[in-house]
Amino acid sequence: MGITYRNRYSKAWSGIIATGSPHADFQNLGKNNANDVFCKLVPFWQLELYFGKVLGRTPLQQADKGGFYPEVYEYARNKDYTGMTHGEIQLDFVYACSKISGMNLLDFFTKWGFLTPVDKELDDYGKKQLTVTQDMIDALKQKVNALGGTRLDVALEYISDNTYELYKTKPAIIKGENATHAPKTFTVGSGDNAVTYNGETITIKNWTNVVTYEVKDETGKFILICSGENAPSSVDTFTIPVRWKDGFRLSAVSVTGERIDIPMN
């Protein structure tokens, strides 16, 4: 994933959640905001991690071979999408997941940009127009809220293959040492697309039960979101694309979404 992103999850979080972008409009470091379809797949896999691996709603564990995604597929198989736009279909997926899970998933899908207005032509196995307006979003929210689903008590947007076991027990964060930072200059891209960043390498030691680290500037704007798993090592390191400044905030995020500030030396 390069010098900044520890893995695909970190890249997806930083390119969609941190930027507040529509799900269809992934933003990468550098000049080349390429359409990274693998980053866009992350929230779909997170639903399987949580409902399947954490809650056991998967054909691998259910005696009837049912589960969350089998029911979503059955919903889609029986749904008449005739005349619906791609934006309407995207929002209907949010509704279907909330209805089938019995949970209100608006917060999850909002953070992943499914409920962010967009009007864009996508080129993914053919060119199609994706349009989602604020009026469409407002109507969808009313529809989902009317289901009366349970609100999530976990930071579902931050579950990953390396942390899903924590979502079964929801342990509190165990604090470690103060973080440190050191200057790091790096280049993203090559040729005319090359961009050089004067950044910082952040080092965090002996913090456990952390699902992600969030770095924000003095205004509260995201700089980077990085995966927090540190097994088998007790040390986490990652690089931000700017120099560390007074007023910046480094937070450790728990399974339940609790944020604990990490002092920086």
Q: Across the structure, where does each feature detected by a protein language model lie?
A:
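Short, glycine/acidic-rich hinge or "gate" loops at secondary-structure transitions
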Residues: Y5-N7
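Active-site-proximal alpha-helical
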Residues: K11-T133
